[in-house]
Amino acid sequence: MYHVYLLSDATGETVERVARAALTQFRDVDIRLRRMGQIRNREDILRALDEVDRAPGIIFYTLVNTELAQFVRNEVEARQLEAVDLITPLLYKLAEFLEMRPQKLPGLQYEMNSEYYRRMEAVDFTVKQDDGQEPRNLHKADIVLIGVSRSSKTPLSMYLAHKGYKVANVPIIQGIDPPGELEEVEPERVVGLIIDTQRLVDIRSARLRNLRQSPRGSYADYRQVEEELSYCRRFYRAHPAWLVIDVTNKSVEESAAEILSRLHGDIRHD
């Protein structure tokens, strides 16, 4: 049996993928991979190399800290072990090409991957909770946006989702009770959106024109819209712990920044 040791200052997933890719070129060989992650200091290195001494094999390592990488090189030479540094030559070449020094942050790639998947999970959640869908999941949302039709609930939800927040949005419709689950959501997670009457009329009229429909119906009628917004304000006043923001003439980015600023410290990621 041949032993291959994989040393990393992060999880070791990257060095293992590289090793496995190379080993596919050598079939019918009995190889044992031993992954050793979270190598952060000299003591960790010495413990790992002591294990290699007991069952000698080749070492592949990825240590972005150049001092630790040099310590490994010195130790394996002194112990007469076989080792391959998979990342330092690459870092030097990139530093030369980009004319800048690399960030020596162990696990940076893993953290970036984790952040990416967290955001994708937030986007997936938010899409499924759009426009009042699946109200049973409201308690799982980091933020719950509520408001009348065309008050920027969906674009705001998606913008926040791409920042990693799980967002649900619920329409407020005069004459129709919101889902009971809304009352069970922690009030500091609920954000009510309000907008100027004429601005909302203009937005709805433009929407109808885009759909090749007449803007003369009640959906874009000034008095009807005014009644909807009055009902919405009364509903918000009945819940004084909710945050209410005016989105009139604000970009999605501006509204999102205001929400995050005013909710700072109250939002948690589950």
Swiss-Prot record:
Keywords: Kinase, Nucleotide-binding, Serine/threonine-protein kinase, Transferase. This is Putative pyruvate, phosphate dikinase regulatory protein. It comes from the Bacteria. Pfam families: Kinase-PPPase. The keyword Kinase applies. InterPro entries: Kinase-pyrophosphorylase, PPDK_reg. ADP binds at G147, V148, S149, R150, S151, S152, K153, T154. It catalyses: N(tele)-phospho-L-histidyl/L-threonyl-[pyruvate, phosphate dikinase] + ADP = N(tele)-phospho-L-histidyl/O-phospho-L-threonyl-[pyruvate, phosphate dikinase] + AMP + H(+); N(tele)-phospho-L-histidyl/O-phospho-L-threonyl-[pyruvate, phosphate dikinase] + phosphate + H(+) = N(tele)-phospho-L-histidyl/L-threonyl-[pyruvate, phosphate dikinase] + diphosphate.
